Amino acid sequence: MRKNAAPKRPVVKDPVYNSEQVTMLVNKILRDGKKSTAERIVYGALEVCREKTGTDPVGTLEKALGNIRPDLEVRSRRVGGATYQVPVEVKPARSNTLALRWLVTFTRQRRENSMIERLANEILDASNGLGASVKRREDTHKMAEANRAFAHYRW
């Protein structure tokens, strides 16, 4: 086990939109080390968002991530032979990571033709409070609410 937490590395801001969130999204989309392909997908999707909404695409992305970010989650805790799902608050960094992970996961599951279309539509849906990634957040919150009785086991 690690003696102490690894230091958080600073996120370099994206050169096009000057945003840390965009950089993190590019890194989440990244597969097989093909960063230029990942950047093309993200920038293309943000351009589609700009065309469809007529507003700043980074603002739309921020709004979408805000609608996806969970406040609570459940963690398993063993107490005397029984495993309880204990609701705990989510730290901001983890909340952001989960939001990006869910956004990309559900983008990949969509049925549009290109990845650019899928990502753009998932971002737009999430910014409007719709879509599978927002549903995932709601499910996580419901699970935490249902297990509220075990909140006194939190650590």
From Swiss-Prot:
**Any one GO BP annotation for this protein:** translation
Query: Do the record's keywords include RNA-binding?
Result: yes
Gene Ontology molecular function, alphabetical: rRNA binding; structural constituent of ribosome; tRNA binding
Q: Which SUPFAM superfamilies match?
A: Ribosomal protein S7
Any one cellular-component term (Gene Ontology)? small ribosomal subunit
**Keywords recorded for this protein, A-Z:** Ribonucleoprotein, Ribosomal protein, RNA-binding, rRNA-binding, tRNA-binding
InterPro entries xref list: Ribosomal_uS7 (IPR000235), Ribosomal_uS7_bac/org-type (IPR005717), Ribosomal_uS7_dom (IPR023798), Ribosomal_uS7_dom_sf (IPR036823)
In its keyword annotation, does this UniProt entry include rRNA-binding?
yes
Record's function text: One of the primary rRNA binding proteins, it binds directly to 16S rRNA where it nucleates assembly of the head domain of the 30S subunit. Is located at the subunit interface close to the decoding center, probably blocks exit of the E-site tRNA.
Quaternary context: Part of the 30S ribosomal subunit. Contacts proteins S9 and S11.
Instruction: Please state which protein family the record places this protein in.
Output: Belongs to the universal ribosomal protein uS7 family.
Identification of the protein by name: Small ribosomal subunit protein uS7
The gene for this chain is rpsG
